[in-house]
Swiss-Prot record:
Its cofactor is Mg(2+). It is an enzyme of class 2 (transferase). Pfam families: TMP-TENI. One of its GO terms (molecular function) is magnesium ion binding. It comes from Salmonella newport (strain SL254). This is Thiamine-phosphate synthase.
């Protein structure tokens, strides 16, 4: 039963790029993306605050669902649409502050145990990864594959879900066929020979999400 402690999100968030710069946020929102995440790693809050402010402003301009990865204090301060946290961040984050600020919350998971932890937090959506091998970041876990992803989707029923990890234009239809609500992509766009064409193809496949 989908009864989060945080504001709800649509079951289908559509194509969900995860990018590390405001420039990419602007490009992709201009290209029609409506769900996006700014993920800048290993910097102090004061080093990323200007980028967070700019990204949130772009999200508002395009009426997009803009999630900030990790920097939850800045997301609250500048009123982002939502925050995305990894498992390792859950214990050190003031979830009640995010909830009180009215921000949505997404949580990463990699196995059944982490799904249990995520469900206990009652977030707005649950991310399931990594589906395929990925070069984007070092992963301690093995790729889950489509069968495991489908099993998690069955378990989570009406909970909004996002698949992530090694998803390419070619693999996207099979990922969506598991019933997952959304697909998050990184290198499929940012490392594409023609990012505009890749984005257009992925939007055709995954859509922009439900209202």
């Amino acid at each position: 039963m989908y009864q989060p402690d945080f504001p709800t999100v649509p079951f289908r968030l559509g194509l969900y790029p995860v990018v590390d710069s405001v420039a990419w946020i602007e490009r992709l929102l201009e290209a029609g993306v409506r769900t996006i995440q700014l993920r800048i790693k290993d910097k102090r809050d004061e080093e990323v605050e200007a980028d967070v402010i700019a990204a949130i402003a772009l999200g508002r301009r395009y009426d997009a669902r803009l999630f900030i990865n990790d920097y939850w204090r800045l997301a609250i301060k500048h009123r982002a649409y939502g925050v995305h946290l990894g498992q390792e961040d859950l214990e050190t984050t003031d979830l009640k502050a995010i909830q009180a600020a009215g921000l949505r919350l997404g949580v990463s998971t990699h196995d059944d145990m982490e799904i249990d932890v995520a469900l206990a937090a009652k977030p707005s959506y649950i991310a399931l990864g990594h589906v395929f091998p990925t070069q984007t970041k070092q992963m301690p876990s093995a790729p889950q594959g489509l069968a495991q992803l489908a099993r998690h989707i069955d378990r989570l029923a009406d909970y909004p879900t996002v698949a992530i990890g090694g998803i390419s234009v070619e693999r996207a239809p099979a990922v969506l066929a598991t019933g997952v609500g959304s697909i998050a992509v990184v290198s499929a766009i940012t490392q594409a020979a023609d990012w505009r064409a890749a984005t257009a193809q992925l939007l055709d496949i995954a859509g922009v999400g439900d209202e």
